[in-house]
Amino acid sequence: ENFFHKPLVNLNHYLNLSDKMRLSSVLYWSGGSGGGTGTYGSVSRKPAVEGEGWYASSPWTWDWDGEIAQNSANVDSAFSDTENRSTGILRNSINRQDTYGLISKLNYDVSDELELQVGIDWRTAGIEHAREVRDLLGGDYYLDFADDNSPDGKRVGLGDIIAYHNETTVDWLGGFVQGNYSKDNLNLYGMGGLSSIKYSYQDHFSVADKVIEADAIYAAQFKGGAMYDIDDNVSLFANIGYVEKPPIMDNVIYFDGTVASDPNNESFISSEAGVNFESERFAVKANVYNTDWKDRNLTKAVTTGQGDSGDTDVIFLTGIQQKHQGLEIEASTQLHKLVRIDAAVSLGTWKFDGDAHGKYQSNEYDDDGNVTGLTTTDYQYALDGLNVGDMPQTSYALGATI
């Protein structure tokens, strides 16, 4: 079961400072609370499967009745002479978050041809991740070994925190300036922006339980473009941009509390050029593009069959280089006032350029299937020349509107 509630509240403000100057702002709050359910510990399977060999076994199902019967008659005198200890339970993986933000833009009409815009974007977010006991499946308590503050195990009941419990914060501040110039057959556009992002992390299941803060990371972006109308039917356009993207928190503060010494921004340089043609009954747009990604970071889940979900291992890839090139064409025609035909084709070649460094992160388990920690192994991954996956590089579309 997945469950989540995410309310959003906006306060909008608009002000005309003069005939040429306008200010628009939005102050917002976004909350969130929810998660998903699953098993935790050693839950019985039918037919029974020993240890962690279930992922390579023949088909099986959860034996809920067998697990409830086992937990209902499992007195462990080391912890209680009367209550039953559950060996497998149901858990909730929960996520709670609060985000506050402000976006404000000032528009100024310099002349009939030139418009300028200046803006800021501020937001701060706090996120809590944890797991909690959802159902003891017939038992009275469960013994969890994930908290370093309880090395001999912590007795937990319904609603108690298990497995992991951490809080993160993200503080973002950005500003930009952009301009648009339009006269006769020529339209020019340009923008520049700067931003900073700062992360913090606190692991409540560590002995120190301290807040770990990373230094602010700064990024920039610059974009420009032009369009020229040759006549009433044909126009040419070109765009170019340089964008820096700060790394995600997993590549800045690691799960063990270590802070990366000098995390690199992802960056890319992108350019495109194309032509538009439009007549009374027919329109077509064609463009070619080239994007060079530098120092890209990717996080990949690995299905190894280890753990309770089968995909708990993660690879953090850093320093990825990619080259994206392609051709895109969109066309439409109005065959009749009641019939419109649309078509599109996209032909791309997206490949990795060079190999990448990666950290392979996997859970550690005890004999009862409880998560007791994490281990990380460094690898070099051979990516050079491979196609970029999870993204369609050749696509066709055809549609009709009647």
Please state what every model-predicted region is.
Residues 1, 6, 82-91, 156-163, ...:
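Extracytoplasmic loops and strand-loop junctions of Gram-negative outer membrane beta-barrel proteins
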Residues 44-81, 130-161, 256-262, 299-316, ...:
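Surface-exposed loop/turn segments flanking beta-strands in extracellular/periplasmic regions
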Residues 6-10, 22, 37-42, 47-104, ...:
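Surface-exposed extracellular loop regions of Gram-negative outer-membrane beta-barrel proteins
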Residues 112, 182, 290-292, 316-402:
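Gram-negative outer-membrane beta-barrel transporters
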Residues 4-5, 30-36, 97, 123-129, ...:
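Structural signature of outer-membrane beta-barrel domains
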Residues 2-38, 86-117, 128-129, 160-187, ...:
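Outer-membrane beta-barrel transmembrane strands
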Residues 89, 115-231, 248, 253, ...:
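Signature of Gram-negative outer-membrane beta-barrel scaffolds
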Residues 20-28, 229, 235-241, 264-327, ...:
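Membrane-embedded beta-barrel scaffold of Gram-negative outer-membrane proteins
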